[in-house]
Amino acid sequence: MNKLGTELANAWMKKTLVDLNGFSENEIPKNRDEAYKALNLFYEELDKKTVGWKIGAVAKEVQKEEGFDGPVPGKIFKETILPSNCSIKYSEIPYSNLECEYAFEIDQDVKIDGELLNKINNFKLYTAIDITSSRYVQSSKNKFDKLVQMYLGISDHGNGGKIIIGEEIKNWHTIDINKIKIKLKINDNVTEPY
């Protein structure tokens, strides 16, 4: 997985794409362990401070529909957090998609265990837009089945690009957060509220 991790890190830094046609079968991740090996090398090569985490495909329904075997994690770096009123150049985030998300601000070290549930109401919750991205030449990635594409996504920084943090959702634990509306302006056109 060394070649994949190194080439993905270079693609991130140089804003280029990785053509998987130049990879042998044993250089493509076939399971999560191999995907994480490439991902960890990617992070070592970049040497950037982690300020948060993104976790994609959290819902079991999404995992089943996409043919995934679990969620798709990735780190958030300081320079990838954007303010809510910003401009984005598509060339800086290739093959991107916009996804409405929530972002927790966790201002203390926590273990992911039963105690986390006791502390979760103390955390701030924000609206967010995750701008997913890919550093692969898409035609070279699309030839693989959905599960291998997921492993390639994990290796590729969890398909991470940038994230826009919106407004804090006050009293989030007492309201139906699934009914929150966002407004998004693309090329000076306001989208429909979702």
Task: Cite the ranges covered by each PLM segment.
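Catalytic-core "active-site belt" of small-molecule-metabolizing enzymes
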Residues: N2-Y194
